Regions:
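C-terminal substrate/ligand-recognition segments
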Residues: 1-6, 143, 147
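A non-catalytic, helix-rich entry segment at domain boundaries
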Residues: 2, 6-90
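Hydrophobic, well-ordered secondary-structure elements that form the walls
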Residues: 7, 62, 105, 146, ...
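Residue-identity detector for threonine
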Residues: 7, 23, 33-34, 67, ...
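Secondary-structure transition/capping motifs at alpha-helix termini
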Residues: 17, 69-77, 108-112, 150-159
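Substrate-binding beta-hairpin/strand module that engages nucleic acids
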Residues: 27-31, 79-80, 143-164
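Non-catalytic protein-protein interaction segments used by genome-maintenance enzymes to assemble
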Residues: 81-153
């Protein structure tokens, strides 16, 4: 949980940064690794060797992420929101209970919106065709909930919505 929250904090800051829509791999990787070191120093005063090793592994993953992110930006996708709150009081279909949540990231390209849920390697959930569906039914509800709750985000209408 700490690892995932730490990673999310770095990615949230990236999503709010000036380099979020850069197509330059080095700029993105530099931002992410610098931010990782900055937050690491703030959060862990006397980290164990295991924690330090996890941070270095995370930096390696950020370099890989930077390559994919730069390609995504070059393909026209722009990060428009990071850690976006879904307003309280949202109802799914005709349910009697309220749903709230946070969408990790929202990207836009022309009239398309992509709702993104970050997963860290320590997560039990991995979004693949096999993990998301069984007999054409969703097995993990987070992304489908994002999709339905995106109707409550007025600035996303009337865009085509995809999930990642």
């Amino acid at each position: 949980m700490v690892y995932g929250n730490f990673t999310h904090s770095i990615l949230q800051n990236f999503g709010d940064s000036d380099v979020r829509n850069s197509t330059n791999v080095a700029d993105i990787a530099d931002y992410l690794t610098t931010e990782c070191h900055r937050l690491f120093d703030l959060r862990f005063s006397s980290p164990s060797a295991v924690i330090r090793a996890q941070a270095e592994l995370l930096n390696n993953r950020f370099v890989s992420f930077a390559t994919k992110q730069a390609a995504r930006a070059a393909d026209g996708w722009q990060i428009i929101s990071s850690e976006r709150n879904i307003p309280s009081g949202c109802k799914l279909f005709d349910s009697t209970f309220d749903i709230s949540g946070i969408i990790d990231r929202i990207d836009r390209r022309d009239n398309e919106i992509c709702l993104i849920d970050y997963k860290t390697p320590n997560s039990n959930t991995r979004y693949t065709q096999k993990s998301l569906f069984k007999n054409d039914l969703f097995t993990d509800l987070q992304l489908p909930l994002y999709f339905f709750l995106s109707d409550y985000l007025e600035d996303l209408k009337p865009h085509k919505v995809s999930l990642a």
